[in-house]
Amino acid sequence: MDQIRLTHLRQLEAESIHIIREVAAEFSNPVMLYSIGKDSSVMLHLARKAFYPGTLPFPLLHVDTGWKFREMYEFRDRTAKAYGCELLVHKNPEGVAMGINPFIHGSAKHTDIMKTEGLKQALNKYGFDAAFVGARRDEEKSRAKERIYSFRDRFHRWDPKNQRPELWHNYNGQINKGESIRVFPLSNWTEQDIWQYIWLENIDIVPLYLAAERPVLERDGMLMMIDDNRIDLQPGEVIKKRMVRFRTLGCWPLTGAVESNAQTLPEIIEEMLVSTTSERQGRVIDRDQAGSMELKKRQGYF
């Protein structure tokens, strides 16, 4: 159909489905990284549409840190079972043996060992040559300059100066042995697009995205939701019930909530229309140092 006749969301949908099918046809062993968040839910929905009525021709991979919200784990298992997806879960055994803890070791070391190294271990273990990721260009400046096909060397490192042009939706997937790509089907989507599409398609999401009374404490300018008894309360800190929700989800000690009364998708969409801050403002890992996200991606991060 002529693009001019398609709505904005349907154009984005068609582009993403084209990318997913292109990778499935071009690469021998692709995988979809499933982080359980709203973007992963949209990406999985698009993949199911791309191959309907068949099943996904690739597995889902969750790189588990052991510190996700309990509701995320429940949602992950329920979703994989409901859709009949093959779900691979990998947790860095070395990090587990070391007892890596975001409270003790800090966000930078926790992310490097449990997420970056864990991801590289899983990709090497299964020999994946392409990995779908639900990141978007509007999230963060290093992601804004990354291509849809993001090439990684045999050590899974990203070189922002060594990228290929992508003209007229033509993608060059030629790689040498040991190399791989990260694929971003949602690159051109915005946070607002994601929420509108979730509402339009009635996509199931983790309830943490909707406002509710939750136990939180204030630490370093962040509202931390207390999800289990591993919290290390500092002197003077008090846990209180507040109406909060999450714009992005990760490890609970490193992900800040936002005060909100948005309990439905239309209310979230309305809230996004007047928001002047990035959804990643609550992610502690983005504050580790200047350019921290780009440095992490150069080392093999998502």
Swiss-Prot record:
A biological process term (GO) from this entry: sulfate assimilation
Annotated disulfide bonds: none
Short name of one Pfam family: PAPS_reduct
The protein's Enzyme Commission number: 2.7.7.4
Catalytic activity: sulfate + ATP + H(+) = adenosine 5'-phosphosulfate + diphosphate
The keyword Nuclease belongs to this UniProt entry's keyword annotation: no
InterPro entries linked: PAPS_reduct_dom, Rossmann-like_a/b/a_fold, SO4_adenylTrfase_ssu, Sulfate_adenylyltrnsfr_sub2
Keywords: ATP-binding, Nucleotide-binding, Nucleotidyltransferase, Transferase
Signal peptide coordinates: none
GO MF annotation, one: ATP binding
Pathway(s) where this gene product acts: Sulfur metabolism; hydrogen sulfide biosynthesis; sulfite from sulfate: step 1/3
Family indicated by similarity: Belongs to the PAPS reductase family. CysD subfamily.
Function, as annotated: With CysN forms the ATP sulfurylase (ATPS) that catalyzes the adenylation of sulfate producing adenosine 5'-phosphosulfate (APS) and diphosphate, the first enzymatic step in sulfur assimilation pathway. APS synthesis involves the formation of a high-energy phosphoric-sulfuric acid anhydride bond driven by GTP hydrolysis by CysN coupled to ATP hydrolysis by CysD.
Subunit structure: Heterodimer composed of CysD, the smaller subunit, and CysN.
Protein name listed in UniProt: Sulfate adenylyltransferase subunit 2
Organism taxonomic ancestry: Bacteria, Pseudomonadati, Pseudomonadota, Gammaproteobacteria, Enterobacterales
